[in-house]
Amino acid sequence: MEEFQGYLELDRYQQHDFLYPLIFREYIYALAHDHGLNRSILLDNVGYDTKYSLLIIKRLISRMYQQNHLIISANDSNQNKFFGYNKNLYSQMMSEGFAVIVEIPFSRRLVSSLEATEIVKSYNLRSIHSIFPFLEDKFPHLNYVSDVLIPYPIHLEILVQTLRYWVKDPSSLHLLRLFLHEYSNWNSLITPKKIIFSKSNPRLFLLLYNSHVCEYESILLFLRNQSSHLRLTSSGIFFERIHFYEKKKDPVEEVFVNDFPAAILWFFKDPFMHYVRYQGKSILSSKDTPLLMNKWKYYLVNLWQCHSYVWSQPGRIYINQLSKHSLDFLGYFSSMRPNLSVVRGQMLENSFIMDNAMKKLDTLVPIIPLIGSLAKVKFCNALGHPISKSTWADSSDFDIIDRFLHICRNLSHYYSGSSRKKSLYRIKYILRLSCVKTLARKHKSTVRTFLKRLGYKIIGRILYGRRTDSFFNLPKSFLYFEEVL
């Protein structure tokens, strides 16, 4: 075991100072609340702002200590789920600034990994009449797949212990423990850790989650190298991220980011095994026999139990055949279906028929998750019935139509490579009818009255995307709508 000790250090020689004095700088809190600012100023321009505001931090700390934690108001119990009560707003402000600071080591590693692998920054992941190339290249050759939800640590102190290998500044870790202890159920084993990670200061907990995942995946890579003499085709580490390089703030982001986060990790590939992390799941796939998949399943279980102190049952990790199981990946339900074809051949006087079976990638639009996403942002109800977008009713006709059109176009571009587009047509119909209902609400009329007054031809244009010849007599906003299309 001693000969492996150097490898198990897990790049801990790359420890970084936390730059603890950054907590006293004002622009840190501006970065914490305005994600549109360019965070590279922390990496490239160290001397961007040398202005310290000790007075602000002293006030925050003093107010934290002046809080009487013995006085609990029942009315405040639902105000702030991370710090329990609304009176801990000062602690939350400091924790958000602290989260920006501790992202610096991870941001440096992310930038260096992108430069080393020469990965091009992609601002728009779109599938225009095709699917993603690696799905077409890899899926037809795979037989078995297993998607396992990565368990959260049973105690948050494990995350702090993991993070201390990345940094040298112990005072920062003590401050981190202070923030974590502010959570009322910090030591509770009953509270689901997934709720803590998803709803309570997601930036800070995502950072801790990244440190936890990077350590366990480094050990997983070590196990792979020790169990196989074949060289890896490729390997690399990406981080789960909330904010990517730059994104326009529009309604389609609300639909996709909340339910289809594009945080992907293609950790390693060898001739027989593929590993990818997506949406907090470890996805293992193989074109070999199930024996190899079973071996890796027990690798994962033992690693979680021995390293992260998380109890996991191997019997609850299923190995599925791609021909009988759909994999939720990149917003598609992907599976392999046999494509049977009959070939008739003739040799001299003898004729024969051959059945030729080929694998074909089948990609489906996930209709139920998409309807759930649209229901969250109030485009429809839980059953998929379109409703008006009340928050947009105060906008101009052109803005309302343009917003709905933008969402429909993005959905069409992304899912145009799907094998079956019936679900996509239903989603587009929900959005277009929601657009009509929003316009009717804006003009304070019923949908039927609005349709009669406007004309069925232009409504058909909105609902079904057909060109019309009667748009010359329409209001100016609808002329803009035709120009946009």
Swiss-Prot record:
GO CC annotation terms, alphabetical: chloroplast
Subcellular location: Plastid, Chloroplast
PANTHER family given in the database record: MATURASE K
Pfam families: Intron_maturas2 (PF01348), MatK_N (PF01824)
Domain of life according to the entry: Eukaryota
InterPro entries reported in the protein's UniProt record: Domain_X, Maturase_MatK, Maturase_MatK_N
Family: Belongs to the intron maturase 2 family. MatK subfamily.
GO biological process, one term: tRNA processing
Record key words, sorted: Chloroplast, mRNA processing, Plastid, RNA-binding, tRNA processing
Gene Ontology terms for molecular function: RNA binding
Record function comment: Usually encoded in the trnK tRNA gene intron. Probably assists in splicing its own and other chloroplast group II introns.
Protein name: Maturase K
